[in-house]
A protein has these predicted regions:
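Acidic/histidine-enriched, glycine/proline-rich intrinsically disordered or flexible terminal extensions
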Residues: 100-120
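An amphipathic, aromatic/His-enriched active-site/gating alpha helix that lines ligand/cofactor pockets
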Residues: 30-43, 61-100, 119
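Short beta-strand micro-motifs enriched in acidic
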Residues: 48-50
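Short, surface-exposed ligand-recognition loops at beta-strand->loop->(often short) alpha-helix junctions
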Residues: 14-26
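Active-site-flanking beta-strand signature of metal-NTP-handling nucleotidyl enzymes
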Residues: 6-14
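Basic/polar N-terminal segments that are highly enriched at the extreme N-terminus
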Residues: 1-4, 118-120
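A generic structural signal for beta-strand entry/edge sites
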Residues: 53-55
Length: 120
């Protein structure tokens, strides 16, 4: 596979059930639309729901770390954080962040489809 220079922010929340998962995704998708997606280098935000109804992972993909850093330096962080707080307060259930530190990552390796290796 070719090298992937993209940069990711992986946001992890614990929630109290499937209804809260759905509310969380709706609220945080709106935050992406209003506060993030128009920045240069933004590629996508994908929301993953655990099948047991207890977790939501959001993976925000940027074209590069430089694009992400530009977003951090030039965006309205205070306004975005207020919108996040308001979104969390508006949920009918409970959602708690599980990240520690800055939740940013680069791709180290990816294994894609191909023939089975038999040289074990």
């Amino acid at each position: 596979m070719s090298a992937d220079a993209s940069f990711h922010s992986i946001i992890d929340y614990t929630v109290d059930g499937p209804d809260t998962q759905q509310e969380f995704v709706a609220a945080f998708a709106e935050i992406q639309e209003r506060w993030v997606r128009f920045y240069p280098g933004y590629q996508s935000a994908r929301f993953y729901l655990s099948t047991d109804g207890t977790r939501v992972y959001t993976i925000v993909r940027w074209a590069s770390e430089a694009d992400y850093r530009n977003f951090v330096e030039t965006s309205d962080t205070e306004g975005r954080m207020a919108a996040i707080s308001q979104a969390l307060a508006g949920l009918s259930g409970r959602a708690e962040a599980r990240m520690t530190g800055i939740p940013t990552y680069t791709v180290a390796r990816e294994v894609g489809p191909g023939p089975q290796r038999l040289d074990v």
